[in-house]
Amino acid sequence: MLHQKIAHKVRKVVVPGISLLIFFQGCLILLFLQLTYKTLYCRNDIRKQIGLNKTKRLFIVLVSSILHVVAPSAVRITTENSSVPKGTFFLDLKKKRILSHLKSNSVAICNHQIYTDWIFLWWLAYTSNLGANVFIILKKSLASIPILGFGMRNYNFIFMSRKWAQDKITLSNSLAGLDSNARGAGSLAGKSPERITEEGESIWNPEVIDPKQIHWPYNLILFPEGTNLSADTRQKSAKYAAKIGKKPFKNVLLPHSTGLRYSLQKLKPSIESLYDITIGYSGVKQEEYGELIYGLKSIFLEGKYPKLVDIHIRAFDVKDIPLEDENEFSEWLYKIWSEKDALMERYYSTGSFVSDPETNHSVTDSFKINRIELTEVLILPTLTIIWLVYKLYCFIF
């Protein structure tokens, strides 16, 4: 018994320590690869983008692998048959992991509970072989993080200051780039915008589709709530709800509509689907906050993690979303979040998003990635650690 306690304590220290070391080494290696691709292919945008996309895919492989080791959660994905065809997510018995057939050009929106939500959303795209095509809208301050900030800028993530007057041009040009390249009519196809406004906004022709060029997919991830759920943000959300004359929700924060509406408008020529995702974590009660239970320190250093991550997905055709009228869109989004709040209410009551096998499809497995890519991204950091351990052993003995 004492043996087991000691082994457990050692594991809680050694595994997170080695995992974090591998993570930082992996990030440095990916950063080196980014610099290599940018240098070697500085005059070949397509080859450079292919190389950078490879490092982006390997980054989610790296992060997912670390998370799978320190927090081996199971994942249960539930989809609504009415909007997401049954079998879109499935367990591949040969590859022994969850795969999917998500649309190539899409936007994913989700409630925001803990800091690692984005990893699961990125992993969902990865199951459809879109891990290299994920784009995330983030706070501008994150771009200044040493090493990671540089890497994220190379991934063309979109950084927002939360001041719409400043963010509009940044968001417009980033989204226009995604849209035009998805149609084979953007800068990666050697094309130029029709014009550039005095404010610096690039205007592209939304009707041009070039079948001879590469069409670059995108999966844009947004959190309309703007921040994760906490006592402080709940209070701020309630004040915001009172300001706009809306009833605050019980289980989610009030969403902001401006950025999402603008994104859907700019991507309209190429977007195929809007995925509405709701995440629930086992071990978090209705009156509790996920960020306090499953914070970064708790997950990566203390070994506290949800045993089961529940993900509910439904899809919307952008043609059915009222994008032209701002008030109508705000009402539509409020309705979507009201349904999300009710979904979370059911989750807290039953512990699942599954309601009826006739209307829902569900698949459950552990949080896995491609073994070949896993080897590819971990081999150098692992060999480095083995070398360091060997040197330490030689020094001591």
Curated annotation (Swiss-Prot):
One of its GO terms (biological process) is phosphatidylinositol acyl-chain remodeling. Disruption phenotype: Phosphoinositides (PIPs) with stearic acyl chains are strongly disturbed. Induces disturbances in intracellular trafficking, alterations in the budding pattern and defects in actin cytoskeleton organization. InterPro entries: Acyltransf_C, Plipid/glycerol_acylTrfase. Keywords: Acyltransferase, Lipid biosynthesis, Lipid droplet, Lipid metabolism, Phospholipid biosynthesis, Phospholipid metabolism, Transferase. It holds the Pfam family Acyltransferase. One of its GO terms (molecular function) is acyltransferase activity. It is found in: Lipid droplet. Its EC number is 2.3.-.-. Its main location: other. The HXXXXD motif is essential for acyltransferase activity and may constitute the binding site for the phosphate moiety of the glycerol-3-phosphate. This is 2-acyl-1-lysophosphatidylinositol acyltransferase. The gene is CST26.
